[in-house]
Swiss-Prot record:
This is Serine/threonine-protein kinase 36. Its cofactor is Mg(2+). Pfam families: HEAT_2, Pkinase. ATP binds at residues 10-18, 33. One of its GO terms (cellular component) is cytoplasm. The active site is at 125 (proton acceptor). It is found in: Cytoplasm; Nucleus; Cytoplasm, Cytoskeleton, Cilium axoneme. Gene3D superfamilies: Leucine-rich Repeat Variant, Transferase(Phosphotransferase) domain 1. Residues 379-397 have a biased composition (Basic and acidic residues). CDD domains: STKc_STK36 (cd14002). It comes from Pongo abelii (Sumatran orangutan).
Length: 1315
């Protein structure tokens, strides 16, 4: 303390006091935080030390800087920057801020969080009170009391920290969370700055948490679309879909304003939160989240039970229950050998969660009690009384007020209401009591009590005895709560089996439906409602899913489902005006059962839905009959034919439940394709009934499209049926009432409960009709402007994508709509950058973004002026598009860093999200890129050559065998796989087709080499493409191998890894009717033979010889009609003959093969003659037994010494020189070869030809006869003149290589040398 002057106190809280101070002997003003040690536990002191350690290493302009820290005897003192105030002061003084100021604060908050998250630090308590105002208008983030630096082995956390107003949904549900919880809090803060209140605020903690979990955010009209889109991304309830790093940095609301602090490399902290996790770490994170997540459906208890509990809780607030509880604790006993029930008391944060989770199911009851909308937040008391009770700071006595240590299951009266109430409270499905239900399940007395209560009270109920109902209802509620809250599926299923569930429940349901006397009882409705709640909770249990199966649970589940269908069928077969409540509850339970079936295996779900067309068809018939009776509340437009007008006074809950059940049967949930097999059969059945001329079903469903409640469900039913029936599409496309209803839905003229989803389904429905009919239904051409308006003006990404899908279909049918480039680019950018909420599978198994991508391609093609393409290529849309594609493919941020040495095992990559972009969408996106780069080729080069290029990472991934296997197995993947591969190859050809800087080209080649693209191209051709489409990939492979030695090795190693398959492919490709393909392959093989050692060339020998070693492939290639093919074949032979003794033997033993080789010497094409002379020359080198057979070639080669092509003359001269050593001197003399070679050596204009002739003469002079001829011709004198001419060249001119050989030959021809 001797370093500082303490000036004045500026703040106080439960942590201690904050003083303004000044460092002695300087003008530096600081803040001193005094934290008392007295009364602090060791854990609190450790947490304090952790905060200090975290703050000590932080250096960022938007994070408060800790200057110093020290301890006194009684306190810990932390010295930090002095700030001018809190952000909270602005809110209290001004209410809210202009959007430009909010934008500046947003950029600074994002900057601070980016810094923290890049260091793997979570703040976990983001709120206005922890944001300080610095000089100059900046902000600084402070208070790291809850911060947590995570180790590399920790991916998610479960401990709950933070302030309720700014807690994310996963926090209040106590699900595992990560850095995205901080981003949710930022969204809450920015919303509050702009609007004046937090996005979720209520006077009760119950209401608050309910709003956070369930309610959408209310958006005032004053917020700009860009800001709203930014907040929508941050305030997305699903953390997996929440706007996060790195996409957050590119959002237009803050792009370019975020400060990124780069630091020198420190210790390896693991993957920062600001980078996408590599696949292996993502798998680890998912496993941790799954292991730590609460299992099962929490909070699935009847609303009425919660309402009663809430009312009791409100009454108890005004009572002093301490003594009563204390007395109860004294009298309670625990039976020997039984596990005590868990304590109901909780820590302050646990209490808030308990209340919050209860509130998530109490939303409707609070609304009914007249609470209404959340009032504006009073600034003077932001936490509210309920929050204070939930988060007491200095009131430890509160913790034990609801504590009940144990419940004695033996000593209490069996029918005690208190006992069942305790059990109901104990089994409340809240996170802090996850162990309590498990304790009950492991208690044999509890299981026996439940079973006996159900048997005894059930028997009394069936006799109509009121006492039975009073005893069984509490047991029902405990069971419902227990089934909804327990996370241990093994223990829960074991308990159900021991307790006789669900058999007892379904038996009670069956007998109650058959008992007329029971149905007359006044309490019958309540009894059935609670019974159905338990059955519904049972069907929703996770042990009914195949991935969580326990012993024979799946068999029991299927049997229970079949029994329930029998009971439902009998109920639906009764008169429609009977048992309305029972009918409604059964239908709701059936809907839950369908949801459980959808998440199960293909076999189980198919058996279930198929039974609705066979043994359980009475259920489906009853549902369809319910839609055609007069109770259906259809809304018929004026002038339309009257169909089944409703009885207005009747309740609409039955038609709503029926339509919801039908939708559950027909609609395949996104991401669960296995259930479609069974649902498709049901849709076929319904479609056949809908297309019958005499059926009243179609008019009923069409009329219901304008009903507020039924509309969405019936849209889904009709849409699903049209997916399988083209005839139904034709009928609806010709039905005026159906089309009018759909048009009105698009135009917003029908009031429906969920306008966004209803409009989305309608847009896809109309797209499906156009797609299936391939023409426009009457009147749809007028819809273009309305759909275009939805596309450009909607801020809901799913609506923009659905509108784009329909616009693309309309455009293909010639409908024009006015879309300005800047408008559609902005709309596309918004849709691609906003979180995707996929609620329905688009037509044709398309992805969420497919329609948008197809529309963009269409617009670019139609409006494809160079200026437009330049605008698009430089727009934000282009960047967002690449990032979205990368996310769909689930690429890590640094894809290139994961590439290693050649690995043909190709470990599988994460499955792409086909629900977002399907194979068709990928093909459209790549075509869009091709259209852009064709006009702007330099853009392609810059995108591919920049370090860490997203485009390059995408293209490389699209060629990986693991991805191609996934693509082939995806719906319609086989159809679009060639398009994807060929588009990728075209894009990768750009660097080779354009004049590219050499250094940049080297970088591109290195990137492709490190990613094993050469190996992948060969595998693509062998396993995925038809022969007619391999020309381009082989051409690219050849170019890579000719340019880069490592790529050539990858090609050879890939052949060695699968020789039989690849040699078979190469054999077929060589003999194809595609000359360019054959030429490229021969060029690739020739380069391989020239560069690599003989040990790597056996596959080429096998390729040419064939399995029967007849060399039929080689014969066909030597006789090919195309000059280029013959030339490349001779060139390949020339390189092989340098190493292959087997090929030399084949030329000698295989009839006619040598003749084909020599035939090339007389070919009309000079390139072929050149290659043939090269091959014959190498055959003549150390020919051995082959030498005599080559004598027939001497006349032809002698004639070629006068060929106008210098290359041919050079090759022939070398070949003749080789033959002189094989005993063919007589033949050479007969053809006057020595004379011809001497003439070439002295007079050929090409230096390399002269050199070849001199080398040949040096070899031939060893033959006495040839030497004598040379001497007689005066070779020494002629060569001396040649040598003299070389010496007279200027000193600056380099001496030709032939000069050395000339001198050597003169020396050899001297008479003394001949001695």
């Amino acid at each position: 303390m001797e370093k500082y002057h303490v000036l004045e106190m500026i703040g106080e809280g439960s942590f201690g006091r904050v003083y303004k101070g000044r460092r002695k002997y300087s003008a530096q003003v600081v803040a001193l935080k005094f934290i008392p040690k007295l009364g602090r536990s060791e854990k609190e002191l450790r947490n304090l030390q952790r905060e200090i350690e975290i703050m000590r290493g932080l250096r960022h302009p938007n994070i408060v800087h800790m200057l110093d820290s020290f301890e006194t005897d009684k306190e810990v003192v932390v010295v930090t920057d002095y700030a001018e105030g809190e952000l909270l002061q602005i809110l209290e003084d001004d209410g809210k801020l202009p959007e430009d100021q909010v934008q500046a604060i947003a950029a600074q908050l994002v900057s601070a969080l980016y810094y923290l998250h890049s260091h793997r630090i979570l703040h976990r308590d983001m709120k206005p009170q922890n944001i300080l105002l610095a000089k100059g208008g900046g902000i600084k983030l402070c208070d790291f009391g809850f911060a947590r630096a995570m180790s590399t082995n920790t991916m998610v956390l479960t401990s709950i920290k933070g302030t309720p107003l700014y807690m994310s949904p996963e926090l209040v549900e106590e699900r595992p969370y990560d850095h995205t919880a901080d981003l949710w809090s930022v969204g809450c803060i920015l919303y509050e700055l702009a609007v004046g209140t937090p996005p979720f605020y209520a006077t009760s903690i119950f209401q608050l948490v309910s709003l956070i979990l369930k309610d959408p955010v209310r958006w005032p009209s004053t917020i700009s679309p860009c800001f709203k889109n930014f907040l929508q991304g941050l305030l997305t309830k699903d953390p997996r879909q929440r706007l996060s790093w790195p996409d957050l940095l590119y959002h237009p609301f803050i792009a370019g304003h975020v400060t990124i602090i780069t630091e020198t490399a420190g210790p390896d902290l693991g993957t920062p939160f600001t980078s996408r996790l590599p696949p292996e770490l993502q798998v680890l994170k998912d496993k941790q989240a799954h292991r730590l997540s609460p299992k099962g459906n929490q909070s699935r208890i009847l609303t009425q039970a919660y309402e009663r509990m809430a009312e009791e809780a409100m009454q108890k607030k005004h009572q002093n229950t301490g003594p009563a509880l204390e007395q109860e604790d004294k009298t309670s006993k625990v039976a020997p050998g039984t596990a005590p029930l868990p304590r109901l008391g909780a820590t302050p944060q646990e209490s808030s969660l308990l209340a919050g989770i209860l509130a998530s199911e109490l939303k409707s009851s609070w609304a009914e009690s007249g609470t209404g909308e959340a009032p504006s937040a009073p600034r003077e008391n932001r936490t509210t009384p309920d929050c204070e009770r939930a988060f007491p700071e200095e009131r430890p006595e509160v913790l034990g007020q609801r504590s009940t240590d144990a419940v004695d299951l033996e000593d209490e009266e069996p029918d005690s209401d208190n006992e069942w109430q305790h059990l109901l409270e104990t089994t409340e499905p809240v996170p802090i009591q996850l162990k309590a239900p498990l304790t009950l399940l492991c208690n044999p007395d509890f299981c026996q009590r439940i079973q006996s209560q159900l048997h005894e009270a059930g028997g009394q109920i069936l006799k109509g005895i009121l006492e039975g109902a009073s005893h069984i209802l509490p047991a029902f509620r405990v069971l419902s709560s227990l089934l909804s809250s327990c996370s241990d599926s093994v223990a829960l299923y074991s308990f159900c089996r021991e307790a006789g569930l669900p058999g007892l429940l379904l038996s009670l349901l069956r007998h109650s439906q058959e008992s007329n006397s029971l149905q007359q009882q006044s309490w019958y409705g309540t009894f059935l409602q609670d019974l159905m709640a338990v059955i519904q909770a049972y069907f929703a249990c996770t042990f009914n899913l195949e991935r969580s199966q326990t012993s024979d649970s799946l068999q029991v589940f299927q049997e229970a489902a079949n029994l329930f269908l029998d009971l439902l069928g009998k109920l639906l077969a009764q008169p429609d005006d009977s048992e309305r409540t029972l009918r409604r509850d059964n239908l709701m339970c059936f809907t839950v059962l369908c949801e459980a079936m959808d998440g199960n295996s293909r076999a189980i779900s198919k058996a279930f839905y198929s039974s609705l067309l066979t043994t359980k068809q009475v259920v489906l018939d009853g549902l369809l009959r319910g839609l055609t009776v007069p109770q259906l509340p259809v809304h018929t437009p004026p002038g339309a034919p009257q169909v089944s007008q409703p009885l207005r006074e009747q309740s609409e809950d039955i038609p709503g439940a029926i339509s919801s059940a039908l939708a559950a049967i027909c609609t395949a949930p996104v991401g669960l394709p296995d259930c479609w097999d069974g649902k498709e059969q049901v849709c076929w059945h319904l479609a056949n009934q809908l297309t019958e001329d005499s059926s009243q079903l179609r008019p009923s469903l069409v009329s219901g499209l304008q009903h507020p409640i039924l509309c969405l469900h019936l849209l889904k039913v009709l849409y699903s049926c049209c997916l399988v029936s083209e005839r139904l599409c034709r009928l609806l496309g010709q039905e005026p009432l159906a089309l009018e209803s759909l048009f009105m839905l698009v135009q917003g003229k029908v009031k429906v409960v969920d306008w966004e989803e209803s409009t989305e389904v309608t847009l896809y429905f109309l797209s499906l009709l156009v797609f299936r009919l391939q023409n426009l239904p009457c009147g749809m051409e007028k819809l273009g402007s309305d759909v275009a308006t939805l596309f450009t003006h909607s801020h809901v990404a799913s609506l923009v994508s659905a509108a784009a899908c329909l616009l693309g279909q309309l455009g293909q049918q010639g409908v024009t709509f006015d879309l300005q480039p800047m408008e559609w680019m902005a709309a596309a950018t918004h849709a691609l950058s906003a979180p995707a909420e996929v609620r329905l599978t688009p037509p044709g198994s398309c992805g969420f973004y497919d329609g948008l991508l197809i529309l963009l391609l269409q617009l670019l093609t139609e409006q494809g002026k160079a200026s437009l393409i330049r605008d698009m290529s430089s727009s934000e849309m282009w960047t967002v598009l690449r990032h979205r594609f990368s996310m769909v493919l689930r690429l890590p941020k640094e894809a290139s860093a994961q590439e290693g040495e050649l690995s043909l095992s190709n470990p599988p990559s994460p499955e792409p999200d086909w629900t977002l972009i399907s194979p068709q969408g990928m093909a459209a996106l790549l075509s869009l890129a091709m259209a852009t780069f064709a006009q702007e080729p330099q853009l392609c080069l810059s995108c591919l050559s920049q370090h860490g290029s997203i485009l390059m990472s995408i293209l490389k991934h699209l060629l990986c065998p693991s991805f191609l296997n996934q693509l082939r197995q995806a719906p319609h993947g086989s159809e679009f796989l060639p398009v994807v591969v060929l588009s990728v190859c075209q894009l990768l050809c750009f660097p080779f087709a354009l004049d590219m800087d050499a250094d940049l080209l080297i970088g591109v080649l290195a990137d492709l080499r490190d990613s094993e693209v050469a190996a992948h191209l060969l595998q693509v051709c062998c396993y995925h493409l038809p022969l007619t489409q391999v020309e381009l990939p082989i051409s690219l492979l050849t170019r890579l191998a000719l340019t880069d030695p490592t790529s050539l090795n990858q090609f050879v190693n890939t052949v060695a890894a699968s020789p039989r398959t690849i040699i078979s492919f190469l054999s077929v490709a060589l003999l194809s009717d595609q000359p360019l393909l054959t030429s490229d392959l021969l060029s690739l093989l020739a380069h391989t033979a020239r560069v690599l050692s003989p040990s790597h060339l056996s596959f080429i020998q096998e390729l040419l010889a064939g399995s029967d070693e007849s060399y039929q492939s080689l014969r066909s290639l030597l006789g090919h009609p195309e000059n280029s093919v013959r030339a490349h074949t001779y060139r390949l032979l020339g390189h092989l003959l340098q190493h292959s003794m087997a090929l030399r033997g084949a030329l000698q033993s295989q009839s006619g093969l040598l003749s084909l080789l020599l035939l090339g010497l007389g070919d009309k094409d000079p390139v072929v003659r050149c290659s043939a002379s090269f091959a014959v020359g190498n055959a003549a080198y150390q020919a051995g037994p082959l030498g005599p057979a080559l004598a027939a070639a001497v006349p032809s080669m002698t004639q070629l010494l006068g060929d106008p092509q210098a290359g041919i003359r050079r090759n022939v001269a070398s070949a003749l020189g080789n033959l002189g050593l094989e005993g063919l001197g007589e033949e050479l003399l007969q053809c006057q070869v020595p004379q011809r070679l001497l003439e070439m050596a002295c007079g050929d204009p090409q230096p390399n030809v002269k050199e070849a002739a001199l080398i040949a003469l040096r070899s031939l002079q060893q033959e006495p006869g040839i030497r004598q001829v040379l001497v007689s011709l005066g070779a020494s004198e002629k060569l001396a003149l040649l040598s003299l001419g070389n010496q007279l060249l200027p000193h600056s001119s380099p001496r030709p290589a032939s000069a050395k050989h000339c001198r050597k030959l003169i020396h050899l021809l001297r008479p003394a040398h001949s001695m």
